[in-house]
Regions:
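Conserved glycine-rich cofactor-binding loop
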Residues: 9, 16-17
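Short, small/polar-rich loop/turn modules that mediate ligand/substrate recognition or access, typified
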Residues: 86, 172, 177, 224-226
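Substrate-binding pocket helix/loop in short-chain dehydrogenase/reductase
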Residues: 96-97, 104-109, 135, 191
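Active-site helix of classical SDR
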Residues: 120, 156-157, 164
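Alpha-helical segment proximal to the catalytic Tyr-Lys
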Residues: 125, 169-170, 222
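Residue(s) in the substrate-gating loop at a strand-loop-helix junction
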Residues: 140
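Short C-terminal tail/terminal secondary-structure segment
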Residues: 145, 214, 225-240
Length: 240
């Protein structure tokens, strides 16, 4: 199936490893022109080489709004236009409500909410002008089922989900779609850090996840917007 994204400019945030890298690799395989970012020069260069397809690496920390804006600006300079935006970022430190200090919350909100707001602010207006664009935000299953010992992530990611659904409605009919993908446990460095003892055979393959992100960026997904796609091997069982 031709997904209709060959030649499109794709900016994938925080793609040195894990689900961001897998998403960038899947987009590049479909012929998208991909720019990625990461904080470490060596790691982001290695990721770009692995992704292939002329992927361009940018050293940029998207853990706050300023970094998110800079990434989209620099990606636009490379690509000409950002047609496909995949927002992604690391999670804040684990911890319970009782042990997490009040002053830890602003950094978590910057990382998992404001960085996404900033990337969308920088990319979406020109998408609307061109009457085409795809925003796919990699969030977390925690927005449906809060995860134990992740109070900061649970709090911030719920906010970004509300923002994305509101934005999807505001740009509906303009040729721009906005969706989020909510991963359960996948075999990534972040999951290994948090759940090192969990059996690996019960986790998802990041490359499969990347294919879902890529479909959401496709021409065929033009009528799919405001959706929250949970990719968790059936772990989330609620009816609503």
């Amino acid at each position: 199936m031709d997904l209709g994204i060959s030649g499109r400019g794709a900016a994938v945030a925080a793609a040195s490893s894990g689900l961001g890298r897998a998403s960038a690799r899947a987009l590049a395989a479909e012929g998208a022109r991909v720019v990625i970012c990461g904080r470490d020069r060596g790691r982001v260069d290695e990721a770009a080489a692995d992704i292939g397809g002329g992927c361009v690496p940018i050293v940029c920390d998207v853990s706050d709004g300023e970094g998110g804006t800079r990434f989209v600006r620099e990606a636009t300079e490379v690509l000409g236009t950002v047609d496909l935006l995949v927002t992604n970022g690391g999670g804040p430190p684990p911890g319970t409500f009782a042990e997490t200090a009040l002053d830890a919350y602003p950094a978590a909100i910057d990382m998992n909410l404001m960085a996404v707001v900033a990337m969308c602010k920088a990319a979406v207006p020109s998408m609307v002008e061109r009457e085409f664009g795809r925003v796919v935000s990699i969030t977390s299953l925690a927005v449906r089922q809060p995860m134990a010992n992740l109070i900061l992530s649970n709090t911030a990611r719920a906010g970004v989900t509300g923002m994305l659904k509101t934005l999807a409605r505001e740009v509906a009919g303009s040729g721009v779609t906005v969706n989020s993908v909510q991963p359960g446990l996948h075999r990534t460095p972040r999951v290994t850090q948090l759940y090192g003892d969990a059996p690996q055979d019960g986790m998802g393959d990041p490359d499969d996840f990347g294919q879902i992100v890529t479909f959401l960026c496709s021409e065929q997904a033009r009528f799919l917007t405001g959706a929250q796609i949970h990719v968790d091997g059936g772990a989330y069982q609620a009816l609503l």
